[in-house]
Amino acid sequence: MLFKKLWRTMGLYKAQFLSMIIMIALGIGIFVGFNMEWYSIDQNTSSFLKETNFADYRLITDEKFSKDELEKVQKIDGVEKAARYFSVNADVKEQEGDSLAMTITEDESVSGFYLVEGADYDPESENGIWLSDKYAAANNISVGDSLTLIYKDTELSGIVQGLIKSGEHMICVRDESQLMPDFKTYGFAYIAPAMYNKAFHRHSDFYEQINIISSKDQSDLLKDVYTTLEKAVLV
């Protein structure tokens, strides 16, 4: 009896039932689609960050970290890798108004990059620049072009050795005032420690950051860092 009544009701309200079925099917399809897309994005992002050796933790100080302090951090139980790191905005001489996040890591296996085109990274290069591929594309810059970065009145002239992507600069904005990336005017570039040393001489040992790769819990790592370095740092 109830079954017959249900069929009678469905017959009277065919359009409404059909609309309801379509809406349910669409809702399920959209939900499954979003979940699949999110899973794909999550997997691709994780793979990219791992491939570019994205740091798990960053120690930051107002002073500088010495090589001895780096070695102490590297010896902390649970720290897989650690490297001194420096990144600062530098003007681009050839592109008025443009800036690049000039980046140096003492160990490319920590906070390094993925090479899209060009030569492999050379830590001993005194004139090599590895440039953001998106900034290069937006400004018609190719491998082999000359580029001059200016930081604190010091010019660093080099040759674009490669075009790259970097997990450390996945969100590439100039400062807090810039909400969205604008690769026409701002990007990033890696230079080797050798180029940094050549340009700044005795001031080239200024690294205000140590980047760490570790699966250790943050609170435990912070406790060990304070005990080891005995100085104020941010993680």
Language-model regions: role of each:
Residues 3-235:
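Membrane transport/envelope proteins' first extracytoplasmic loop
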